[in-house]
Amino acid sequence: LAIRIAALLAAACFLGVALGLRAITGDWSGSGWLAQYSGTALYASMVYAGVILVAPRVSAAWAGVIATVFCWTVEAAQLTGIPAELSARNILVRAALGVHFDWADILWYPVGIVPLVVVDWLLIEPWRRVQPADPERTPSHHA
């Protein structure tokens, strides 16, 4: 449960940083280079946190692979035009799916994911390995 709470808080922090950068720069459209690329990296960071939230026992490396492939899949879907059409109707869908394909985004997703994989691998994964998979099913030594 602690890992899931930490992942949820991390995702909220990444969203806060993204919105804060847009507020500071005044670039709410995301068209400027800072808003666009930081937003792409922070989106990928939120996806990584989402992977940990859904599957807290997954290794850092696999969480990174899953998050990167998810981001690349969403980016590739933008080539179909479907995300753009859905985004025109809802700002939350626009934030989640984007509007148009950008090769630079393909490179910026790992920028948001790789540092989290390293931190997870060095600091959290060793702790995660010593925790019981299901505390309620772990035999108790209490009488």
Model-derived features: positions:
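Short, intrinsically disordered terminal tails adjacent to the first/last structured region
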Residues: 130-143
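Bulky hydrophobic segments
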Residues: 1-131
